[in-house]
């Protein structure tokens, strides 16, 4: 198939569910070419549904990372001078190619990450929307002008690229998060060194093939693989001016501090504990269905998953009905038709999830739905956890204070809306939250008083479309400018202000002016 021609026939493993005793290797992408790494250190990537190795990812050597960076630096000199219409044209082509190949991208995501095919297509689609927004770059990157700020003097601002930027992406959205990063970076005239998660490299590599086909010049985006050494290289390299990161708290704080100390601009999206507040006047059927989907979809591995529910007053009587809906969700391999909940990413992740469930039980929570011992016929070696619900949870319990990142919903109870708002605001995270109600006054009170960056009213996962920005706050984000939207443009650009004077009289100065200019 033409889609994979540049990577080579051996790359068909990226989208086909076939395994071999000698797993193929994932390439680096440097200067427009897919390059075999010379490293001696490799990381196995497992299909979460089968535990079989699908590819081996290199830990790029220092020389390889430096080569990629030099390619980015060289490409910036020419790419930043291309017309904005040329950069826009690449986005138009990339957008069309992603649409055309969405199914192939989704197959790879399901194979490496585990989520259902429908959810994987959503992963690609939400990233595609950022590409579509970047097609408006001539309007998004406009500066400002004030004519005649003084006699014969004009001042205007230019929105300029930074230089070489870097992106460090997580495992849970193999296509969406890289597409939050490199399209905005390169359309504004930067180049990017991208490090996808070593657990799910395939989607990024397929996107690089599409980027080549879209006509993006060599070196504008390069891809390296690795773990700590690759992260440190990105944080320390003087040529890299800005770093985008999405992932865990520990990594996000480390990258923000290390890169920041080296003078880099950083945006760091980290952990979350998103609450859904359910009032008794809500539409019961819609609310419970939305809760189940938002809590257990993608096996709970979304930074905007509703992992916590606060039932207010009489709505607490709906909890058994929620359990009934969760029990009906089908747990299976992501590529199997009808699957609602796929596996989690790894055996270690499954163990951590199970340990947090057990900690809740030991601390006094009620385990009203237990998915720990689920077995999926034909996929007994997969990393499965079924939908799990812990009720009567208190804010001091470990299952509440830590991000579980699995198909686990913890339930708290509140007597009234004020108490529910206090619970949400006392949590250190501020990624997102939602309220379910038919009362406009209650919804308005919630929106005004809640301390979270993204708020849904009868919308369980309020991730904004890219004409807005992804605006997590408090413990969920570090940095000054958020991802995509207007803030994303600001993150990847800097302002150059020009003041020019052309005297109408064109009279030559007869002597130097040493007094402070007053702009009159």
From Swiss-Prot:
Catalytic activity, EC: 1.2.1.27
Subcellular location: Mitochondrion
Family membership: Belongs to the aldehyde dehydrogenase family.
SUPFAM superfamilies: ALDH-like (SSF53720)
Species whose genome carries this gene: Drosophila pseudoobscura pseudoobscura (Fruit fly)
Predominant localisation class: mitochondrion
Name of the protein described by the UniProt record: Probable methylmalonate-semialdehyde/malonate-semialdehyde dehydrogenase [acylating], mitochondrial
Role, per record: Probable malonate and methylmalonate semialdehyde dehydrogenase involved in the catabolism of valine, thymine, and compounds catabolized by way of beta-alanine, including uracil and cytidine.
The keyword Mitochondrion appears for this protein: yes
GO terms for cellular component: mitochondrion
Pfam families referenced in this protein's UniProt entry, alphabetically: Aldedh
Gene Ontology MF, one: methylmalonate-semialdehyde dehydrogenase (acylating, NAD) activity
EC class: oxidoreductase
Record: active site: 303 (nucleophile)
Subunit record text: Homotetramer.
Reaction(s) catalysed by this chain's protein: 2-methyl-3-oxopropanoate + NAD(+) + CoA + H2O = propanoyl-CoA + hydrogencarbonate + NADH + H(+); 3-oxopropanoate + NAD(+) + CoA + H2O = hydrogencarbonate + acetyl-CoA + NADH + H(+)
Single GO biological process annotation from the record: thymine metabolic process
Keyword entries, A-Z: Mitochondrion, NAD, Oxidoreductase, Transit peptide
Native organism taxonomy: Eukaryota, Metazoa, Ecdysozoa, Arthropoda, Hexapoda
InterPro entries: Ald_DH/histidinol_DH (IPR016161), Ald_DH_C (IPR016163), Ald_DH_CS_CYS (IPR016160), Ald_DH_N (IPR016162), Aldehyde_DH_dom (IPR015590), MeMal-semiAld_DH (IPR010061)
Chain positions recorded as NAD(+) binding sites: 169, 171, 195, 198-199, 248, 403
């Amino acid at each position: 198939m033409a889609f994979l021609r540049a990577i080579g026939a051996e790359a068909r493993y990226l989208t086909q569910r076939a395994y071999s005793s000698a797993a193929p290797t994932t390439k680096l992408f440097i200067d427009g070419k897919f390059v075999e790494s010379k490293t001696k250190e490799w990381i196995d990537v497992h299909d979460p549904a089968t535990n079989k190795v699908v590819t081996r990812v290199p830990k790029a050597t220092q020389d390889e990372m430096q080569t990629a960076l030099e390619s980015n630096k060289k490409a910036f000199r020419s790419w930043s001078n291309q017309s904005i219409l040329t950069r826009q044209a690449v986005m138009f082509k990339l957008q069309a190619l992603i649409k055309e190949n969405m199914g192939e991208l989704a197959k790879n995501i399901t194979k490496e990450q585990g989520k259902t095919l429908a959810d994987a297509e959503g992963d690609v689609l939400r990233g595609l929307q950022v590409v579509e927004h970047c097609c408006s770059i001539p309007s998004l990157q406009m500066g400002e002008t004030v004519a005649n700020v003084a006699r014969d003097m004009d001042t205007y601002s230019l929105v300029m690229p930074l230089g070489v930027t870097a992106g460090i992406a997580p495992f849970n959205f193999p296509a969406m998060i890289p597409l939050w990063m490199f399209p905005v970076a390169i359309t504004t005239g930067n180049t990017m060194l991208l490090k996808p998660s070593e657990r799910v490299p395939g989607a990024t590599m397929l996107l690089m093939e599409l980027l080549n086909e879209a006509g993006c010049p060599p070196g504008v985006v390069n891809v390296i693989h690795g773990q700590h050494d690759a992260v440190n290289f990105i944080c320390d390299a003087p040529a890299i001016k800005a770093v985008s990161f999405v992932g865990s708290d520990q990594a996000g704080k480390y990258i923000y501090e290390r890169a920041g100390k080296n003078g880099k601009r950083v945006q760091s999206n980290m952990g979350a504990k998103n609450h859904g507040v359910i009032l008794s006047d809500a539409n019961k059927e819609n609310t419970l269905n939305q809760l189940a989907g938002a809590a257990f979809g993608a096996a709970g591995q979304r930074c905007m998953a509703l992992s916590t529910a606060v039932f207010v007053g009489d709505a607490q009587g709906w909890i058994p009905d929620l359990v009934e809906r969760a029990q009906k969700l089908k747990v299976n391999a992501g590529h199997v038709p009808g699957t609602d909940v796929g596996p989690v990413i790894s055996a270690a992740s499954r163990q951590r999830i199970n340990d947090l469930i057990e900690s809740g039980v030991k601390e006094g929570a009620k385990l009203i739905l237990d998915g720990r011992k689920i077995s999926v016929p034909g996929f007994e070696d997969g990393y499965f956890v079924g939908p799990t619900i812990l009720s009567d949870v208190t804010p001091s319990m470990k299952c509440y204070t830590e991000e579980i990142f699995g198909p686990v919903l913890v339930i708290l109870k509140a007597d009234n809306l004020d108490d529910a708002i206090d619970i949400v605001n006392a949590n250190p995270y501020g990624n997102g939250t939602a309220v379910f109600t038919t009362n406009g006054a209650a919804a308005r009170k919630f929106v005004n008083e809640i301390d979270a960056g993204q708020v849904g009213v009868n919308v369980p996962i309020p991730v904004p479309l890219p004409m807005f920005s992804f605006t997590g706050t408090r413990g969920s984000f570090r940095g000054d400018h958020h991802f995509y939207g207007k803030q994303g443009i600001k993150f990847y650009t800097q302002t150059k202000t020009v003041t020019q004077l052309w005297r109408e009289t064109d009279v030559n100065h007869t002597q130097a002016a040493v007094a402070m200019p007053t702009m009159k």
